[in-house]
Amino acid sequence: MVKKNIVVLTGSPRAGGNSDQMADALIRGAEQAGHLVTKISTAQLNVQGCVACMGCYSSADRPCCHNDDFNRIAPLIERADVVVFAAPLYWSTFPAAIKRVIDNFYCFYHGGRAVAGKRAVLLSCGEDTAYNMFDGIQRAYELILPVLGWSNAGMILAPGVNDPGDVQKTDALKRCEALGKTL
């Protein structure tokens, strides 16, 4: 098997929370399969939102005109074979911290960077018990992929998960670890 370079972007402001545990389970499986994994907590980053200035890669050493942490993580994302989005559901979509990072993916698109061919994974959890609560985040994820030329490698959604540790009462962690092994 070929070793994959995997970047896991977590979006929860709650370190060790349910979506973080989902990410960690996927990472465990991926590492057991021999893959190299880098976990990035977007809530700990200083990333400005895209302001549509069209200054993407106007400086060879900076993907974004903002002097922020996106410029540090962009090369990791560019080199990745797989990008994982792990986030709790906030108002039916991605939380602000990971959304700012995703918005800055425009740098890759506008800057003409060769990022096509990657695979992506969505891991998400939310308080409601109905699966349709994930419609917003799932649709956003599905719309991002073709723009970047990425394909879906899997999606694990865990409803009924809100309080710290609730995800441990579901089969989501087992499914995340199994998915990590298949990447």
Task: Please state what every model-predicted region is.
Residues 1-86, 90-111, 157, 165-183:
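N-terminal beta1-alpha1-beta2 submodule of the flavodoxin-like/Rossmannoid cofactor-binding fold
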Residues 96-97, 109-154:
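Short, glycine-/small-residue-rich phosphate/pyrophosphate-handling segment
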Residues 131-132, 163-165:
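Short active-site-adjacent structural elements
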Residues 160:
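Active-site rim beta-loop-alpha module in soluble metabolic enzymes
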